[in-house]
Protein backbone atom coordinates (compact mmCIF):
# COMPACT_ATOMS: atom_id res chain seq x y z
CA UNK A 1 0.00 0.00 0.00
CA UNK A 2 2.82 2.40 0.87
CA UNK A 3 4.48 1.73 -2.50
CA UNK A 4 1.20 2.43 -4.30
CA UNK A 5 0.74 5.74 -2.49
CA UNK A 6 4.32 6.71 -3.28
CA UNK A 7 3.74 5.94 -6.95
CA UNK A 8 0.51 7.96 -7.01
CA UNK A 9 2.17 10.97 -5.38
CA UNK A 10 5.12 10.76 -7.78
CA UNK A 11 2.88 10.62 -10.85
CA UNK A 12 0.36 13.21 -9.68
CA UNK A 13 2.50 16.25 -10.62
CA UNK A 14 3.05 14.80 -14.10
CA UNK A 15 -0.68 14.36 -14.65
CA UNK A 16 -1.34 17.92 -13.51
CA UNK A 17 1.17 19.41 -15.94
CA UNK A 18 -0.25 18.23 -19.26
CA UNK A 19 -3.65 17.76 -20.79
CA UNK A 20 -5.39 16.30 -23.81
CA UNK A 21 -8.11 18.79 -24.70
CA UNK A 22 -11.41 17.98 -26.35
CA UNK A 23 -11.99 19.80 -29.63
CA UNK A 24 -14.54 22.24 -28.22
CA UNK A 25 -12.66 22.75 -24.97
CA UNK A 26 -9.58 23.76 -26.96
CA UNK A 27 -11.62 26.02 -29.24
CA UNK A 28 -13.04 27.82 -26.19
CA UNK A 29 -9.59 28.24 -24.61
CA UNK A 30 -8.08 29.51 -27.86
CA UNK A 31 -10.95 31.95 -28.34
CA UNK A 32 -10.60 33.22 -24.76
CA UNK A 33 -6.88 33.78 -25.41
CA UNK A 34 -7.56 35.82 -28.55
CA UNK A 35 -6.76 33.45 -31.42
CA UNK A 36 -10.12 33.75 -33.22
CA UNK A 37 -9.33 35.74 -36.38
CA UNK A 38 -5.88 36.62 -35.09
CA UNK A 39 -3.94 37.87 -38.13
CA UNK A 40 -6.94 36.82 -40.24
CA UNK A 41 -6.93 33.15 -39.25
CA UNK A 42 -10.26 31.84 -38.00
CA UNK A 43 -10.50 29.77 -34.85
CA UNK A 44 -11.14 26.69 -37.01
CA UNK A 45 -7.66 27.06 -38.53
CA UNK A 46 -6.04 26.97 -35.09
CA UNK A 47 -8.06 23.99 -33.86
CA UNK A 48 -7.36 22.11 -37.10
CA UNK A 49 -3.63 22.79 -36.76
CA UNK A 50 -3.62 21.62 -33.13
CA UNK A 51 -5.44 18.43 -34.10
CA UNK A 52 -2.91 17.45 -36.76
CA UNK A 53 0.13 18.73 -34.86
CA UNK A 54 -0.52 17.13 -31.47
CA UNK A 55 -3.93 15.46 -31.30
CA UNK A 56 -4.83 18.25 -28.82
CA UNK A 57 -2.17 16.95 -26.40
CA UNK A 58 -0.20 19.63 -24.56
CA UNK A 59 2.56 17.14 -23.71
CA UNK A 60 3.27 16.10 -27.31
CA UNK A 61 6.94 16.26 -28.32
CA UNK A 62 8.58 15.29 -31.58
CA UNK A 63 12.28 15.19 -32.38
CA UNK A 64 13.35 16.53 -35.79
CA UNK A 65 16.23 15.39 -38.00
CA UNK A 66 18.09 18.68 -37.40
CA UNK A 67 18.27 17.92 -33.67
CA UNK A 68 15.53 20.35 -32.68
CA UNK A 69 12.31 19.31 -30.94
CA UNK A 70 8.70 20.41 -31.38
CA UNK A 71 6.72 20.99 -28.18
CA UNK A 72 3.13 21.12 -27.04
CA UNK A 73 -0.29 21.49 -28.51
CA UNK A 74 0.98 23.49 -31.52
CA UNK A 75 4.37 21.74 -31.80
CA UNK A 76 6.47 24.86 -31.37
CA UNK A 77 10.08 24.33 -32.43
CA UNK A 78 13.16 24.65 -30.21
CA UNK A 79 15.40 25.81 -33.07
CA UNK A 80 13.48 29.06 -33.51
CA UNK A 81 10.92 29.74 -30.81
CA UNK A 82 11.79 28.28 -27.39
CA UNK A 83 14.83 27.13 -25.42
CA UNK A 84 15.16 23.49 -24.38
CA UNK A 85 18.82 23.79 -23.38
CA UNK A 86 19.78 21.17 -25.97
CA UNK A 87 19.23 22.65 -29.43
CA UNK A 88 22.43 24.28 -30.73
CA UNK A 89 22.06 27.92 -31.82
CA UNK A 90 18.45 28.17 -30.62
CA UNK A 91 16.98 31.59 -31.42
CA UNK A 92 14.32 31.41 -28.66
CA UNK A 93 12.30 34.16 -30.37
CA UNK A 94 9.41 33.73 -27.91
CA UNK A 95 11.77 34.08 -24.95
CA UNK A 96 10.48 31.01 -23.11
CA UNK A 97 11.73 27.63 -21.96
CA UNK A 98 10.18 24.89 -24.11
CA UNK A 99 8.92 23.17 -20.96
CA UNK A 100 6.17 25.80 -20.51
CA UNK A 101 4.67 24.62 -23.80
CA UNK A 102 3.90 21.24 -22.22
CA UNK A 103 1.63 22.63 -19.49
CA UNK A 104 -2.14 22.16 -19.41
CA UNK A 105 -2.48 25.96 -19.41
CA UNK A 106 -1.93 26.95 -23.06
CA UNK A 107 -1.46 30.68 -22.41
CA UNK A 108 2.27 30.67 -23.24
CA UNK A 109 1.74 28.41 -26.27
CA UNK A 110 -0.85 30.84 -27.62
CA UNK A 111 1.35 33.86 -26.91
CA UNK A 112 4.20 32.21 -28.80
CA UNK A 113 1.88 31.12 -31.64
CA UNK A 114 0.82 34.75 -32.04
CA UNK A 115 4.49 35.71 -32.34
CA UNK A 116 5.08 32.95 -34.91
CA UNK A 117 2.07 33.80 -37.07
CA UNK A 118 3.07 37.48 -37.01
CA UNK A 119 6.56 36.69 -38.30
CA UNK A 120 5.68 37.01 -41.99
CA UNK A 121 4.76 33.52 -43.15
CA UNK A 122 1.51 33.28 -41.21
CA UNK A 123 0.25 29.80 -40.43
CA UNK A 124 2.49 28.36 -43.14
CA UNK A 125 4.99 27.96 -40.29
CA UNK A 126 2.98 24.85 -39.33
CA UNK A 127 3.53 22.00 -41.80
CA UNK A 128 0.42 20.16 -40.61
CA UNK A 129 -1.69 23.27 -41.23
CA UNK A 130 -0.22 23.67 -44.74
CA UNK A 131 -0.80 20.01 -45.60
CA UNK A 132 -4.09 19.28 -43.83
CA UNK A 133 -5.97 22.51 -43.06
CA UNK A 134 -5.11 25.23 -45.58
CA UNK A 135 -7.79 25.56 -48.23
CA UNK A 136 -10.24 23.23 -46.44
CA UNK A 137 -13.49 23.96 -44.62
CA UNK A 138 -11.97 24.50 -41.18
CA UNK A 139 -15.30 25.65 -39.73
CA UNK A 140 -16.04 21.97 -39.08
CA UNK A 141 -13.43 22.08 -36.30
CA UNK A 142 -15.60 24.41 -34.22
CA UNK A 143 -19.03 23.26 -35.40
CA UNK A 144 -21.28 22.36 -32.48
CA UNK A 145 -19.03 24.06 -29.93
CA UNK A 146 -20.61 26.53 -27.52
CA UNK A 147 -18.39 29.52 -28.01
Swiss-Prot record:
Main localization of the protein described in the UniProt heading: secreted
Domain C-type lysozyme residues, every copy: 19-147
Any GO MF annotation of the entry: lysozyme activity
E.C. no: 3.2.1.17
Biological process annotations from GO: defense response to Gram-negative bacterium; defense response to Gram-positive bacterium; killing of cells of another organism
Effect ascribed to mutating residue 55 to S: In DL1 and lysozyme II
Entry's Gene Ontology cellular component terms: extracellular region
Family annotation (Gene3D superfamilies): 1.10.530.10
Pfam families, per database record: Lys
CDD domains with a match to the protein in the record: LYZ_C
Protein keywords: Antimicrobial, Bacteriolytic enzyme, Disulfide bond, Glycosidase, Hydrolase, Secreted, Signal
Reactions this protein catalyses: Hydrolysis of (1->4)-beta-linkages between N-acetylmuramic acid and N-acetyl-D-glucosamine residues in a peptidoglycan and between N-acetyl-D-glucosamine residues in chitodextrins
Additional remarks: Lysozyme C is capable of both hydrolysis and transglycosylation; it also shows a slight esterase activity. It acts rapidly on both peptide-substituted and unsubstituted peptidoglycan, and slowly on chitin oligosaccharides.
PANTHER family: LYSOZYME C
Family: Belongs to the glycosyl hydrolase 22 family.
Biological role: Lysozymes have primarily a bacteriolytic function; those in tissues and body fluids are associated with the monocyte-macrophage system and enhance the activity of immunoagents.
Protein name: Lysozyme C-1
Highest classification ranks of the organism: Eukaryota, Metazoa, Chordata, Craniata, Vertebrata
